[in-house]
Amino acid sequence: MMHSIKCDVAIIGAGPAGLAAAIAARKEGAKRVLVVERDNKLGGIFQQCIHPGFGLTYFHEELTGPEYAGRFIDEMREHDVDTLLNSMVLEISPDGGMIVADRKSVV
């Protein structure tokens, strides 16, 4: 089954950089931002970094990796960023379209 999703900005990967990019895109005026993540949760490698030491510069407090990712995930949700989990980008076309596959369909 094929679906069409329109967005102003599509970000591939919901690791730290992807989450920050999604938030920045919304703050800069992008109306619809979509993050495509191949895993079943947001946060990327930070979900595995259970030791403290993150967040000192940005949040001014010491956080574990999952706590740090959680702050960005919360902020991303506050800015109404859309996500596709368990999905992989298969192709990006010159006109800005992309083909994304999840476990059930191709978008």
Which residues are covered by each model-predicted region?
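A short, basic/flexible loop-to-alpha-helix module at the beginning of a structural domain
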Residues: 1-8, 103-105
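Feature captures the FAD/FMN-dependent oxidoreductase FAD-binding
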Residues: 17, 28, 64-105
